[in-house]
Amino acid sequence: MPQLNAYLSFDGNCAKAMRFYTRVLDARLEALITYGQTPADMPTPASHADRIMHAYLVHPDFALMAGDTPPGIPYQGVSGVMMTLTYPTAAEAQRVFAALAEGGNVTMPLGETFWADAFGMVTDRYGTPWGVNGGARMQPPK
């Protein structure tokens, strides 16, 4: 069965970001491969040796991949997309939202909406925008 997974790009702080996401999302970091670990026939500039070529985070319900931008490719930041998380309860959404907001920028405070008991938007300290839902509703409240 096909899977659709996000692949985030970073500018030298991928390892820190993925360790942060592992903790916040209660996930497991399965791969953290540096450019310096690539085969000898794939030369890497010394400036990129410690940067992450590929990171793979797994959770029972999703996977997240990431890497630092390759040598010679300028980092462009995240634009036009948002990662979204949906939790069964508003309390779970609040915990994750608060952790992502620490050192980040809240663009929409977590609050009740017609589609969820809680929804908010935040750009975390690594520049990744998130939408966090909790207690999804199938129909608007009356």
Predicted feature residues:
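Short aromatic/hydrophobic contact patches that present stacked aromatics
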Residues: 5-7, 82-84
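Core segments of cupin and vicinal oxygen chelate
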Residues: 8-61
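Short, solvent-exposed loop/turn segments at the edges of secondary structure
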Residues: 52, 78-80
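Vicinal oxygen chelate
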Residues: 2, 30-33, 44, 56-58, ...
